[in-house]
């Protein structure tokens, strides 16, 4: 690809960043579509995010992806949030229109699209959702919008727990879905929740390098063949949770599905053009 002075820059702001497949995926898509943009990853955390956003404006970047740990903080630095992003309380995409920043969240729509593509109808179903960060809450919000009946969210009693409670309140007030929040340490409640769930979704970084040998499921007997298990982590591709689920006979959806579909929506928001889906799936080796 020959980059000229006419090219615009799109970024990804996250920490850590080296594991991300987004730069490779987006640049392959941009090159295939023949569009004058280049996508670069920048190591940015909560302490440098404000400066990075000022840099985005100063450099007239077209926009940026936002990943851990910046997704919730990023809401404070945009001029406008979509209704879904307000419900989530986190964004993963910023579009810069001449200095006016719009915040979107494509994590939820991407993950739910991957579930739909598998043939699973979530309407009226119950989900156990692990985590309360930006990705997890985005998935929960979109699932509620799409008609899921109940979400049982489990998170450790950390800084995200109160945010999870606030998220549940927003969803309960604005949708027909019922969201409850429980401490992940409450194994009795967790066991009961899984026994009646239709979907188990991991929205945490457990399973991601360097936590690739870990899973939040300590007792694999909790996994049943009729349970759909979905994963946000894509590096490694086959997380310990997915291995446990497949051994238990569960249908699974790996993290590539979310990466692909959320990235496709980001691409279209930044460029206004269709994402070359089939080409990207082929060159990236995605099974989703």
UniProtKB/Swiss-Prot annotation:
Reactions accelerated catalytically: L-quinate + NAD(+) = 3-dehydroquinate + NADH + H(+); L-quinate + NADP(+) = 3-dehydroquinate + NADPH + H(+); shikimate + NADP(+) = 3-dehydroshikimate + NADPH + H(+); shikimate + NAD(+) = 3-dehydroshikimate + NADH + H(+)
Protein name: Quinate/shikimate dehydrogenase
Source superkingdom: Bacteria
Binding site for NAD(+): 132-135, 155-158, 205, 232-235, 255
Residues that hold substrate according to the record: 71, 107
EC number of the protein: 1.1.1.282
GO terms of molecular function: quinate 3-dehydrogenase (NAD+) activity; quinate 3-dehydrogenase (NADP+) activity; shikimate 3-dehydrogenase (NAD+) activity; shikimate 3-dehydrogenase (NADP+) activity
Family recorded in the similarity comment: Belongs to the shikimate dehydrogenase family.
Lineage: Bacteria, Pseudomonadati, Pseudomonadota, Gammaproteobacteria, Enterobacterales
InterPro entries according to UniProt: Aminoacid_DH-like_N_sf, NAD(P)-bd_dom_sf, Quinate/Shikimate_DH, SDH_C, Shikimate_DH-bd_N, Shikimate_DH_fam
Record's function text: The actual biological function of YdiB remains unclear, nor is it known whether 3-dehydroshikimate or quinate represents the natural substrate. Catalyzes the reversible NAD-dependent reduction of both 3-dehydroshikimate (DHSA) and 3-dehydroquinate to yield shikimate (SA) and quinate, respectively. It can use both NAD or NADP for catalysis, however it has higher catalytic efficiency with NAD.
SUPFAM superfamilies reported in the protein's UniProt record: Aminoacid dehydrogenase-like, N-terminal domain, NAD(P)-binding Rossmann-fold domains
Top-level enzyme category: oxidoreductase
GO biological processes: amino acid biosynthetic process; aromatic amino acid family biosynthetic process; chorismate biosynthetic process; shikimate metabolic process
């Amino acid at each position: 690809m020959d980059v000229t002075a006419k090219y615009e820059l799109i970024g990804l702001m996250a920490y850590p960043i080296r594991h991300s497949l987004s730069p490779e995926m987006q640049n392959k898509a941009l090159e295939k579509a023949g569009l004058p943009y280049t996508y670069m990853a920048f190591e940015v955390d909560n302490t440098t995010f404000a400066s990075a956003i000022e840099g985005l404006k100063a450099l007239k970047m077209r926009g940026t992806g936002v990943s851990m740990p910046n997704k919730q903080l990023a809401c404070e630095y945009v001029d406008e949030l979509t209704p879904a992003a307000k419900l989530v309380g986190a964004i993963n995409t910023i579009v810069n229109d001449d200095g006016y920043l719009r915040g979107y969240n494509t994590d939820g729509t991407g993950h739910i699209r991957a579930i739909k593509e598998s043939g699973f109808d979530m309407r009226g179903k119950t989900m156990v959702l692990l985590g309360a960060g930006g990705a997890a809450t985005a998935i929960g919000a979109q699932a509620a919008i799409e008609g899921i009946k109940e979400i049982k969210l489990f998170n450790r009693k950390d800084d995200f727990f109160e945010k999870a409670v606030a998220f549940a309140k927003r969803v309960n007030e604005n949708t027909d879905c019922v969201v409850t929040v429980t401490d992940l340490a409450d194994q009795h409640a967790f066991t009961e929740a899984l026994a009646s769930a239709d979907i188990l979704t991991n929205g945490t970084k457990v399973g991601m390098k360097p936590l690739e040998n870990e899973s939040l499921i300590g007792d694999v007997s909790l996994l049943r063949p009729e349970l759909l298990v979905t994963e946000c982590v894509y590096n490694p591709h086959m997380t310990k949770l997915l291995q446990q689920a497949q051994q238990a006979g569960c249908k699974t959806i790996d993290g590539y599905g979310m990466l692909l579909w959320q990235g496709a929506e980001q691409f279209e928001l930044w460029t206004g053009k269709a994402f070359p889906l089939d080409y990207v799936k082929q060159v990236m080796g995605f099974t989703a």
